[in-house]
């Protein structure tokens, strides 16, 4: 039987000693949004709760200011 080993999740913001997640950093924010525009949960990304709250707030601010779209797949 083969066992599947998952890579350990870690918080990227803690590793890089980020003090505050900026809503103007679009490249970072897009890594935490699905292709449908939803915010990826921390249980999948491994982000700590403190940074997940900052991340959600930054994404919502960027959406409001039209820096990133609410949804990507308009047809």
From Swiss-Prot:
InterPro entries: Ribosomal_bS18 (IPR001648), Ribosomal_bS18_CS (IPR018275), Ribosomal_bS18_sf (IPR036870). NCBIfam families: S18. Part of the 30S ribosomal subunit. Forms a tight heterodimer with protein bS6. One of its GO terms (cellular component) is cytosolic small ribosomal subunit. GO terms for biological process: translation. Binds as a heterodimer with protein bS6 to the central domain of the 16S rRNA, where it helps stabilize the platform of the 30S subunit. It holds the Pfam family Ribosomal_S18. The gene is rpsR. This is Small ribosomal subunit protein bS18. Keywords: Ribonucleoprotein, Ribosomal protein, RNA-binding, rRNA-binding. One of its GO terms (molecular function) is structural constituent of ribosome. Belongs to the bacterial ribosomal protein bS18 family.
């Amino acid at each position: 039987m083969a066992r599947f080993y998952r890579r350990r999740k870690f918080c990227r913001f803690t590793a890089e000693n980020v003090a505050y997640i900026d809503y103007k950093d679009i490249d970072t924010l897009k890594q935490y949004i699905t292709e449908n525009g939803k915010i990826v949960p921390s249980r999948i990304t491994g982000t700590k709760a403190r940074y997940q709250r900052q991340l959600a707030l930054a994404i919502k601010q960027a959406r409001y200011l039209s820096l990133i779209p609410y949804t990507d797949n308009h047809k």
